[in-house]
Amino acid sequence: MKTKTLKLKFYTDPGHGWLAVKRVLVDQYMVSEPVTGYSYMNGKTVYLEEDYDAPRFLEAVKGAGYIVEIEHRNSPHKDSPIRRYEHFN
């Protein structure tokens, strides 16, 4: 069986962090428990909040056989623009 790799970006600002995931993957792997309103969306990307939604997504994709590689992007001195995106619904 060929190993599947999923490359994701994790964005942080001084107060919080979000894992950027394509909406199609969220819909596929987070079926049993819906995403909370603490996550955001912009276009076809969902920004899963770090405390609850992101860990559940990572657990689901790892359980499906993916190896996950995460690139960290940090905004240490100002709020991330993600905070202005639409809340997930």
Locate the predicted segments by residue:
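A short, exposed loop/beta-hairpin motif centered on an aromatic-Gly-Thr core
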Residues: 36, 41-50
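N-terminal acidic leader/helix
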Residues: 4-36
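Short secondary-structure junctions
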Residues: 31-39, 65-72
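Short, compact, well-ordered microdomains
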Residues: 49-89
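Sparse, context-dependent recognition of short Cys/His-centered cofactor- or disulfide-binding micro-motifs
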Residues: 4-6, 42, 70
